[in-house]
Every structure is written in C-alpha cells, then in structure tokens.
Amino acid sequence: MASNGHTLRLVINRDKHDSVIRGLYLVTDHDDNLIPRVEAAIDGGARVVQYRNKNQDRESRLALGLELRELCRRRSIPFIVNDDLEMAVSLKADGLHLGQGDGDPREARRVLGPGKIIGVSTHTLSEALEAQAAGVDYIGLGAMFPSRSKEVEHVAGSELLAAIRSSISIPIVAIGGITRDNGASVIDAGADAVAVISAVLSHPDPALAATEIALLFNRRAPFPRGSVLTVAGSDSGGGAGIQADLKTVTLLGSYGSSVLTALTAQNTRGVSGIHGVPPAFVADQLDAVFSDIPVDVVKTGMLFSAETIVAIAAKLTEYRRRMVVVDPVMVAKGGANLIDRGAVSVLKERLFPLAYLVTPNIPEAERLTGANISDEESMREAARRLHRLGARNVLLKGGHLLAGDSVDILFDGAAFHRFVSPRILSKNTHGTGCTFASAIATYLAQGDPLREAIARAKRYITAAIRLAQPLGRGHGPVNHILAAEDVRDR
C-alpha cells in the first residue's frame, strides 16, 4: 500500500514497439536445402520466419514445416504459417498469415486463441484499417517494388506506407521486391519489418544477405547508433590508427570499441618505433569485446604480423563476424613499413575471404596484386584481382593518381561504381585511409547500404582534408571535428 492509502498498480502499455514483428521477416521459398538456408538467415539476423509452401503434397509440407518449427523454437524465432489455418494448428505454429480474401482473421483468432500472431496482407488504407479493426497483430503491405517471386498487381510504394503508418497502431511489414539497396526507404517511411524471399534465400551467402538487410534497421535507433569495433595499431600522434578510428566513429554518432594490435612511437614526421602486441593478447581483447558488447561492424587497420592476422581471423570466424571492413594498412605516411613481409600473403589468404569490404589505396593494391596501376582501367583490373582473393566487395582508392578528380572504384563482383570528389592539394593528409574506412564502417553500422555508406564516408573524408589545419612539422592530420560538423549540416 502507498502512504496515501491507494494501491499502486503496474500498468503496461503494449503497443507496436513490444511486438515480435520487427526487423527482417523471412518468407520461405520452394527451392532445395531450405533448412540450412533458413538457419543461415537466422544467423544473419532474421527475426521472424513465415512458412510458405504451396507446391508439395500435404504430408511433405507438414514434414518440412515440423523441421522449420523446431529450428525456429531452438532459435527463439516466431514461426508463422502462410494461408493455411489447418496447417498452423497441426504444426502448433506461433501464428498465421492470411492473404487478402484468403480467410477470416476473426475465425483464425477463434481457432488459434489469443496468444497467437495473426497477420493479413493489405494493399490499401481501407484494407489496413479493416484488418486492424478485425484484431490482427500486424499487416503486410505491398508490393513496395516489383517482385521476382510473383506477379505484382498492386504497387503500394513508400508514400502509401507512410500514410498508413500515420493511421494505424499495429506493426506494418513491408513486402515486395525489397533488397539491401532499397530497403532503407521503406524503413524510413515507417515499416516495422521488411519481408524478403529471394533477396536472402537466393543469395549465395544467406547469412550475409540477412545481415545486410537487418542492419538497415539501425537507422531508427537512438544515438549512439550502431557499434563499431576497430582492430588496429595505436598512433601516439593521434592522427591515424585507433585514435583516428575512434574519433571518426564517435563524432559520426556510433559507439566505438577497440582492440590494439601494436603500439607506435609516431608523430607527423613519421614512425620511430613499433611494439607489436602479442597475438594471444590480441585474441584476449577480441574475446573481451565480442563476449559482452554488441558489434555491428568490425574495421581492421594495422595488423603488423602474420601471427596476429591468424589470431584475428580465427576470432572473426569463431564469433561469426560478417560485416568486416579491412583497411590493409602497410606503409605509414612517412614511409615506415607497418606490416611484416611475410604477413602480406597471410592477409590475403586468411583475412580477405572474411572481408565484407577491403579498402586499399593504389600502393597497397599494387603490392597485393603485383600490378602497375596508372589509370582507372588498371584500377578496375586490380579490383577484379583483389575480388578473386575472396572479399565480397573491393573499394580501390584513387587518391594517389596525380591528375584529375579523386576517383574511388567499388567492385562488388558484378559491377563497378565510381565515387568522385575534387582533388584537394594538402600535406595534411595523415590518417586519411584509417578515417575513410572507419567512416564507411560507421555508416554501415548506422543502417546505410554499402554504396550509400561509401558515398557519405567520401563526403566526410573530403571535408576532413579540406578543413585540415597545420599541426606539427610533417604531414598533419585531417580535421575530424569540423568534418563531422560539415557533413551533419548538409
């Protein structure tokens, strides 16, 4: 009893934010090896699984559904059956999704009970309002874009989604043609979840594809938004390495953690000494971070020795880190070698196959490939060679070319993309590579798809060079603070 004689009651307001319907909503396809592909997608961040199977006989559908249900229960993932109330009952599913006109949600509620999840497909505001009035737990809204899985009669689009979001209180699952590259627009319009099929299950690496889409939801998180772990050497001068990484991550609005691989005695004039951190202690640091702190993106820089690279690769594999940005730091601005001679081959063999993105500059790409790079065409060829080493994406930075704009080239295995900025003549460029790569990692962690993350990071590093102030008697650092303010104001 309270002192005034009134009983205190705990009142819980259950709104859409308490719903399990959020994030990446996976709808199954009809292809082979479904169970391992769905499990990989769950590893990558799928939060809900809908079982859709209209091709097999009932016995086969039931057997496969039981396998999926057990997988989802082991992983604490809601398991929803598509358009088959009897099947949902037989499988003891967590819920049922009904197409528009494919069943009565009130009858489904009566049969399944109040604790089950019921969703309905909608295409218009009136259908959405009707579904909410019928007591469903969420609506599916689509199609957002043309889809490969079926013929699209209604393209709802982001504008209708935004209008419906302001009119209903239950979660909205956007569906239809959603990919890594267009998913952000429907999340920004108000989708609580995005439903995908082929964008994940037809991908050669469903876990990575799921991670790419799941990360897009970080764009709605409060600041610090997203988490970046930098694995790199320390710069006592503060312009590069761990120091530059953490400045960038923090100033751009994410949470930064760090693992030190080496200590350097360094200033604007160069590196006078390097003390490598024992590989076992590098592994201990990685264990400490990964076992406790959520990490969305890992960024690596100076790794120093082959033994350290082996230790890092082992931990990235153990903890199933997929979003890894590898900046293959080899030489300091002043010319000092920052990696052992034998470590380069280990870097290519052990770390590149784990990389989501590698970001070499031209001298680094030449050392990694043995090619001579003198123009954009030779940059493209070098990017192809680097991609064949196993990295998912290669961003070859063209700042070392002497003429014209500063052009960076992204190769994703299928197409090239150019990122262009004016060339700025300045000797205050210490830490540019570290800063650029950590900015890309930060924007990825904040929910930007890859090309947008690179474009935003390119604007940031260009501003950091343009706004740099002289410091010391050598190559001064870029201006992290004013650059962050500059890109924030745009």
UniProtKB/Swiss-Prot annotation:
The keyword Cytoplasm does not apply. GO terms for cellular component: cytosol. Gene3D superfamilies: 3.40.1190.20, Aldolase class I (3.20.20.70). Binds 1 Mg(2+) ion per subunit. It catalyses: 2-[(2R,5Z)-2-carboxy-4-methylthiazol-5(2H)-ylidene]ethyl phosphate + 4-amino-2-methyl-5-(diphosphooxymethyl)pyrimidine + 2 H(+) = thiamine phosphate + CO2 + diphosphate; 2-(2-carboxy-4-methylthiazol-5-yl)ethyl phosphate + 4-amino-2-methyl-5-(diphosphooxymethyl)pyrimidine + 2 H(+) = thiamine phosphate + CO2 + diphosphate; 4-methyl-5-(2-phosphooxyethyl)-thiazole + 4-amino-2-methyl-5-(diphosphooxymethyl)pyrimidine + H(+) = thiamine phosphate + diphosphate; 4-amino-5-hydroxymethyl-2-methylpyrimidine + ATP = 4-amino-2-methyl-5-(phosphooxymethyl)pyrimidine + ADP + H(+). Pfam families: Phos_pyr_kin, TMP-TENI. Keywords: ATP-binding, Kinase, Magnesium, Metal-binding, Multifunctional enzyme, Nucleotide-binding, Thiamine biosynthesis, Transferase. GO terms for molecular function: ATP binding; hydroxymethylpyrimidine kinase activity; magnesium ion binding; phosphomethylpyrimidine kinase activity; thiamine-phosphate diphosphorylase activity. 4-amino-2-methyl-5-(diphosphooxymethyl)pyrimidine binds at residues 50-54, 82, 121, 150. Its EC number is 2.5.1.3, 2.7.1.49, 2.7.4.7. 2-[(2R,5Z)-2-carboxy-4-methylthiazol-5(2H)-ylidene]ethyl phosphate binds at residues 147-149, 177, 197-198. Pathway: Cofactor biosynthesis; thiamine diphosphate biosynthesis; 4-amino-2-methyl-5-diphosphomethylpyrimidine from 5-amino-1-(5-phospho-D-ribosyl)imidazole: step 3/3; Cofactor biosynthesis; thiamine diphosphate biosynthesis; thiamine phosphate from 4-amino-2-methyl-5-diphosphomethylpyrimidine and 4-methyl-5-(2-phosphoethyl)-thiazole: step 1/1. Residues 1-213 are annotated as: Thiamine-phosphate synthase. Residues 229-490 are annotated as: Hydroxymethylpyrimidine/phosphomethylpyrimidine kinase. CDD domains: HMPP_kinase, TMP_TenI. Coiled coil: none annotated. PANTHER family: PHOSPHOMETHYLPYRIMIDINE KINASE, THIAMINE-PHOSPHATE SYNTHASE. In the N-terminal section; belongs to the thiamine-phosphate synthase family. Condenses 4-methyl-5-(beta-hydroxyethyl)thiazole monophosphate (THZ-P) and 2-methyl-4-amino-5-hydroxymethyl pyrimidine pyrophosphate (HMP-PP) to form thiamine monophosphate (TMP). This is Thiamine biosynthesis bifunctional protein ThiED. It comes from Geobacter sulfurreducens (strain ATCC 51573 / DSM 12127 / PCA). The lineage of its organism: Bacteria, Pseudomonadati, Thermodesulfobacteriota, Desulfuromonadia, Geobacterales.
